[in-house]
């Protein structure tokens, strides 16, 4: 899969306002009421990621979850990253 152009990245990000470009990846931070709620969300993300065959970097700090997406094989952001980000947003 080909890397997206800067213009395409900007366009895709406009439909995902909670996601931010932190080159070379996009990231989203979500806060929950507690650790259990954060872990429940992470487990749902894991299911989506497995179905997509594309896996985010996930950092869990008590009730705070940071997700980061980049397509390592392509050396940057691709449609796969934005498709999975949209899938993750649907969980919230």
From Swiss-Prot:
User: What are the protein's GO molecular function terms?
Assistant: 4-alpha-hydroxytetrahydrobiopterin dehydratase activity
GO biological process terms, alphabetically, are: tetrahydrobiopterin biosynthetic process
| Reactions mediated catalytically | (4aS,6R)-4a-hydroxy-L-erythro-5,6,7,8-tetrahydrobiopterin = (6R)-L-erythro-6,7-dihydrobiopterin + H2O
Q: Which UniProt keywords apply?
A: Lyase
List the InterPro entries. Answer: PCD_sf, Pterin_deHydtase
**CDD domains in UniProt:** PCD_DCoH
UniProt EC number: 4.2.1.96
Q: Does the keyword Cell membrane apply?
A: no
Q: Could you tell me which Gene3D superfamilies the record lists for this protein?
A: Transcriptional coactivator/pterin dehydratase
Give a yes or no for keyword Endoplasmic reticulum in this entry: no
Q: What class of enzyme is it?
A: lyase
User: NCBIfam families given for it?
Assistant: PRK00823.1-2
To which protein family does this belong?
Belongs to the pterin-4-alpha-carbinolamine dehydratase family.
The protein depicted here goes by the name: Putative pterin-4-alpha-carbinolamine dehydratase
Organism per entry: Acidobacterium capsulatum (strain ATCC 51196 / DSM 11244 / BCRC 80197 / JCM 7670 / NBRC 15755 / NCIMB 13165 / 161)
């Amino acid at each position: 899969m080909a890397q997206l152009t800067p213009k395409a990245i900007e366009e895709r990000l406009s439909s995902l306002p909670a996601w931010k470009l932190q080159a070379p990846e996009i990231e989203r931070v979500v806060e929950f009421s507690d650790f259990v709620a954060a872990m429940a969300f992470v487990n749902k993300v894991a299911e989506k990621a497995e179905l997509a065959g594309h896996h985010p970097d996930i950092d869990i700090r008590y009730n705070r979850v940071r997700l980061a997406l980049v397509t390592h094989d392509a050396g940057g952001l691709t449609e796969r990253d934005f498709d999975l980000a949209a899938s993750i947003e649907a969980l919230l």
